[in-house]
Design a protein with these regions (language model features):
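C-terminal structural segments of small proteins and small subunits
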Residues: 79-109
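Histidine-anchored nucleotide/phosphate-binding helix
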Residues: 16-32
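Hydrophobic anchor at the start of a short beta-strand
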Residues: 3, 34-35, 69
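A short beta-strand-loop structural module common to alpha/beta enzyme folds
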Residues: 35-43
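Charged helix-capping and loop-helix junction motifs
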Residues: 19-22, 51-57, 89-90
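A glycine-rich helix N-cap at a beta->alpha junction
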Residues: 52-80
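Short, glycine-rich nucleotide/cofactor-binding loops
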Residues: 3-18, 43-50
């Protein structure tokens, strides 16, 4: 199955982000395809250098699984993330809509 995850909480703001990371690992271990992780709202902070272990987790996952890491452009702008470090990219909400067509499941974490 092909999955897209929507992460709406920051790395240190509760269990939502931790659950997303655990779910992403479980998908990889079970042979599912994680197509895209869409970071929205406070979730875009996963791409900031102030949480290097979180940033490294998603980067490693993207490289090993071939997943896209997408930051909502409006949310990223609010946090001053105008030039994210690859493999994180900026896209609008249209990328999330597109994921709805390309994925079998979209799971959100907040």
């Amino acid at each position: 199955m092909k999955y897209t995850l929507v992460v709406m909480t920051g790395p240190e703001n509760g269990m939502g982000h931790d659950r997303a990371r655990g779910f992403a690992q479980a998908l990889a271990q079970q042979g599912h395809r994680l197509q895209r992780v869409f970071f929205y709202g406070d979730g875009v902070r996963a791409a900031q250098g102030e949480t290097p272990q979180c940033q490294q987790f998603w980067t490693t996952l993207a490289e090993s699984e071939g997943s896209e890491l997408v930051l909502c452009s409006a949310s990223a702008e609010r946090y001053g993330l105008t030039e994210p470090v690859p493999p994180f990219t900026l896209m609008g909400l249209g990328a999330l809509m597109e994921a709805g067509f390309d994925s079998d499941r979209i799971i959100s974490f907040d």
